[in-house]
Amino acid sequence: NSNEFGNFIAIDDELKLPEDQPEPMTLEHTEPMHSDPLEMEEVEMEDIEGEMILDIDSCDANNSLAVVEYIEDLHAYYRKIEYLGCVSPTYMDEQLDLNERMRAILVDWLIEVHDKFDLMQETLFLTVNLIDRFLAKQNVVRKKLQLVGLVAMLLACKYEEVSVPVVSDLIHIADRAYTRKDILEMEKLMLNTLQYNMSLPTAYVFMRRFLKAAQADKKLELVAFFLVDLSLVEYEMLKFPPSLVAAAAVYTAQCTVSGFKHWNKTCEWHTNYSEDQLLECSMLMVGFHQKAGAGKLTGVHRKYGSAKFSFTAKCEPACFLLENKNQP
């Protein structure tokens, strides 16, 4: 069995979870979210067009881990440095033996691997970020692309996880296409190429904050992460900064769940994006949602179509966002 990489990509059946396994969904390290708007104190931070903006941090005043005193400064800093982790949206043009379809196959597969290893959500975002930043600086032959993905996930695990998959597990899941020496050599090359810089904000960092601003319940949270996971696979989404991708995912999720356009002043204030600024990215996400279960790259759809993720993939896409696509 071969594919566009020239190497076998497989996930061992023993590592797969049954799609209907009733395992509860948890997202690690998310900020406290509230399904009841009454739980969040209404504090008028700024009156824009007569609409109240909620102080989304008042409920965490007694939670030292929420660092309420610094949270706004932290996110202002994240917005300032997020572009350092972005790559050219045309970097694949410089690759001699790769194309964007191969990247999509790799990321789709890694999303399944990430799920089977039950890793934290931020690990996936960092994995894809490391892949893109590495490929933007280093030419890679297609038979080594899967190795790049495995090593990126290994590094992301070492940075984010408490328990890290052992190298032998990675070798096994790649059907022994690579040796331990291959993995360790690629790990060294990747770290040197990236100058050991692994602490740049990904879309996940912004998702936590923006979901809190949206007062997201579990359903909205799952739909937003479903949409942003779909976006990870798509090379064309590299033209958007992580904060915009996160904001668009929350906006599109709100539209998907409610059935109408929904972006209030609290969301606009805390994301610093207006609805108009999100529409281009949001419409792309709706398109990804429409085709999620079709074609060969269905890893995200299978993941979110399981009981573990509350069958989120079965929700109807917000197609009404596409209706005014060609209008000014």
From Swiss-Prot:
Q: List the disulfide bonds.
A: none
One matching Pfam family is: Cyclin_N
Instruction: Please give the SUPFAM superfamilies that the UniProt record associates with this protein.
Output: Cyclin-like (SSF47954)
Instruction: Give one GO molecular function term.
Output: cyclin-dependent protein serine/threonine kinase regulator activity
PROSITE patterns under this entry? CYCLINS
As annotated in Swiss-Prot or TrEMBL, what is the tissue specificity of this protein? Only expressed in organs with dividing cells.
What is one Gene Ontology biological process annotated in the Swiss-Prot or TrEMBL record? cell division
- Annotated keywords: Cell cycle, Cell division, Cyclin, Mitosis
Q: Which domain of life is it from?
A: Eukaryota
Q: How does it assemble?
A: Interacts with the CDC2 protein kinase to form a serine/threonine kinase holoenzyme complex also known as maturation promoting factor (MPF). The cyclin subunit imparts substrate specificity to the complex.
Which protein family is it in? Belongs to the cyclin family. Cyclin AB subfamily.
Q: What does this protein do?
A: Essential for the control of the cell cycle at the G2/M (mitosis) transition.
- This chain belongs to the protein called G2/mitotic-specific cyclin-2
Organism annotation? Medicago sativa (Alfalfa)
